[in-house]
Amino acid sequence: MEYYRHSSADTLHALDSTPDGLTQAQADERLARDGHNVLAEPPKPSVVKRFFAQLADPMILVLLAAALVSAVTSAYAHESFADVIIILLVVIINAVLGVYQESKAEQAIAALKELSAAHSRVLRGGKIVTVPSETLVVGDVLVLEAGDAVPADARVIESASLRAEEAALTGESVPVSKSADALTADGEIGLGDRSNMLYLGSSIVYGRGRAVVTETGMQTQMGHIADALTQTKENKTPLQLRLSQLSRILTWLVLGICAIVFAVGVLRAGTISGRVVLDTFLIAVSLAVAAIPEGLAAVVTIVLSIGVTNMSRRSAVIRRLTAVETLGCAQIICTDKTGTLTQNRMTVTASAGSDEHLLATAMALCADAVHDPDTDTVTGEPTEAALVRWAVTLGLSPSALRAQLPRVAEAPFDSARKMMSTLHSDDGHIVQYTKGAPDVLLPLCDRIWIDGQAVPMTDAHRAEIAAHNRDMTGRALRVLAAAMRTYDALPDDTSPAALEQHLCFLGLAGMIDPVRPEVVDAIRDCRSAGIRPIMITGDHVDTASAIARELGLLGPGDEAVTGAELGAMDDDTFRRRLQHISVYARVQPEHKTRIVQAWRDAGFITAMTGDGVNDAPSIRAADIGIGMGITGTDVTKNVADMVLADDNFATIVGAVEEGRRIYDNIRRAVKFLLGSNMSEVLSIFAATMLGFTILEPVHLLWINLLTDCFPALALGMERAEPDIMTRPPRSARESIFAHGVGFDCVYQGVMCAILTLAAFFIGHYMEYGVWTVTNSPDGTTMAFLTLSMAEIFHSFNMRAHRASLFTLRTPNWALVGAAAASLALTTLCIYVPFLANAFDFTPISAAEYAVAMGLAFLVLPIVEGVKCVQRAAAKRRARA
């Protein structure tokens, strides 16, 4: 039933209630039938479930498969399970890191679950009683006054200047006047226009009234939003999609290489026996170990965690680890207006009148908002609070004014006459101040205050006032007028009709919820980074458009549409107009989700920011949802991927930069690790084809997990490139091998493999003095040292994709430290007896050590030369 279309009496009858409320027996019966007035929360997964969820990552599944195969072969061959244990340790550490980071984010948010008032005042059997809000039932009559939180959806049945602030639900920052009158408008009436309804999540900021509860718990508007969140599927991030693609490629690559090696090995043996098959299979497994970058999953997780830490320092709290880099490829940011682009605080920005101080005095005294001079804070209805703050900025003291001119009578504001009047004692006389809508107040004025005195109002004065009013409303300001009247003594008749006539006009004050000062620069930075901001708000279209123009969001050719207009569009029409619409006003929650989904369907990576409950479904539907930590509701914070701890839209720009840096660094690490594994695969493949063993599986695990992981992690700390915020966002469909990364992995893998094979043969020659193809202890040790150190030196090449290493101005000290640590560990592994025995190494001479290091160092000049050729080729293509 649309209660707002029916009278108060009809609503009470439909709900089987009375103006005196329910009896206690009726309330108990309905509570037992309908349940408590609480929002259902989806059960949170246990730590165990979250741990196993980490194991569902495709890269982890590949590692687990490798561990299983390795375990079977080790058991069959009665060999050590060291490989299996090491791989499983990597998997466990990676999963623990993921769970820890997500848990840490949850603690950082520390969301409050109190979404409604703890207690509410209701009428039970005609008496006002206080009850826990969770025990409210349909039909209860609420007793409300300024400062109360609305504990359930309700239909107003009595109103005395009642106003409610509904920004969290509708997005509109200006409080809405509430009355008991039924609405008669045709067509759909949006939440923000239902002037006789109150909703859970809103609050009373002025006046008092009574309302009958129409819905509780999950049946409220907030409950519908919470329910919609549980129906919305989480989207995979671009990084998750790319890593899944990489896992599939690696899986097929491993299977293909193993099949080839197994087939060639059996054919070379010339006979098929259990021993031949087992030996060949073990070689194939060693290749699988070489091909799989065991440390990649852990490196990605740790690099993301580093990014999370960096973002938290910039006031951005990440709740979902893989969402860290998603902002780096965001193309659309759909942002709420109130509290996100604006300050969510009405502020006087313009005035018109002969005496600004007198105008501010009138506005401040004809208001119920209170200024605390000790804390310099103002409490009260937002519009009146803005007027009081304005008086303070002009050097006036509202508390001193009230002491000097105490209020002795008043005609409170009501929505019918759109005015409020107060009478004050002034040294034996009475002065009246009246404020209200200009179109209502101006006709009641027959004088105007000019140059310190009241003069008769003329048509020219009225025209000038009307022009000022048009100018302010044209800038989407909310305009109030003020007037005064003096008496020798307090009049006997203080009714509004008697007081509000023969007034002296003082002036106009225009106010608006102003933009955050830093947002203008933030939006400009977004545009330079190729990101398009879209405003989505529940506020009026004129106000939204004015703010959008001020911010540069609404330019020539851009459109602003209302939720009603959007609702009237079919999907085809909306798709055609989507690219031209920059502002959406008076929208409902389902409209926001539709907008986000339309951009996603068009192939754009979309972010959604917001603080109100009305933003939560669209935040959940977006590729990355951004909530506000201070003004944001708990529902919104709980579904967001990222929470801005300072509620600052400008923080998003820093998060975008960090996201891009993280992706660049992950790609550096992936390129480094895959190139390294490519060199290992090619080395073992070539050695197998030639009939000798160059490295054992345990050697490869050492390289993959110790030698390679430290530099890969250090690459994850690389600083952002200078052009990172001037290049367009990358495509969500862009392969991780794009921009020549795949080619680099192949040629650099071949390069390191050739150097490794060369080290083996040189080592064999230095040991035996002959060039032959056979197993060699010194050759294996030199090959291990060369491969390890070649990858260490090669990690420095990864700092720049195409630029020369020697053009980088800032050193990566983490990488220098990682290289030194890897060199030390590798050297210890060769020369410390128990380690050398464990890895079956032979200590090599100083000359052999120097030769191996020299071969490894060659990766630097070789890659620098190739980069030079690539840069020249790129310049030729650019000129063509």
Give the ranges of each region predicted by the language model.
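A C-terminal functional module that forms or caps the active site or interfaces directly
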Residues: M798
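Generic alpha-helical transmembrane segments
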Residues: T707, T780-S795
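Membrane-interface starts of transmembrane alpha-helices
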Residues: A82, N775-M782
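Conserved cytosolic headpiece of P-type ATPases
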Residues: M1-P729, E734-F737, V750, Y765, ...
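Core segments of transmembrane alpha-helices
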Residues: S679-E680, D744-T756
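Transmembrane alpha-helix/helix-exit interface in multi-pass inner-membrane proteins
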Residues: V261, A753-F761
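Long hydrophobic segments that form regular secondary structure
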Residues: F761, M766-E767, N775
